[in-house]
Amino acid sequence: MAQVVWTWRALADLTAIRDYIGQFSPLAAQRMALRLKTAADSLAEYPERGRLATATLRELVVVPPYVIRYYVADGLVHIVRIRHAARL
């Protein structure tokens, strides 16, 4: 099983998403953050699950419209960004 590593930028994206949704519903923000984190962490079991976005970067659509971008190297899954699909 691979290990999942979060970049500081991906963690900042997760925080920004949670903060934005939290303006409207703190409970929904907490649930969305948990769903995104759980989906990213699940890549430890199936790292090739996401579609290829570039030659090395993969992406996993979690909860439309959010996309987790990551790459796999040396037994590690590097979570690079979590973006709204309109901002890709």
From Swiss-Prot:
Pfam families: ParE_toxin
Leader sequence residues: none
Traits of the deletion mutant: No visible phenotype when deleted singly or as the relBE2 operon.
InterPro entries in the cross-refs: RelE/ParE_toxin (IPR007712), RelE/ParE_toxin_dom_sf (IPR035093), TA_system_RelE-like_toxin (IPR051803)
UniProt keyword list: Toxin-antitoxin system
Function as written in the Swiss-Prot or TrEMBL entry: Toxic component of a type II toxin-antitoxin (TA) system. Its toxic effect is neutralized by coexpression with cognate antitoxin RelB2 but no other ParD or RelB antitoxin.
Entry's family note: Belongs to the RelE toxin family.
Protein name in the entry: Toxin RelE2
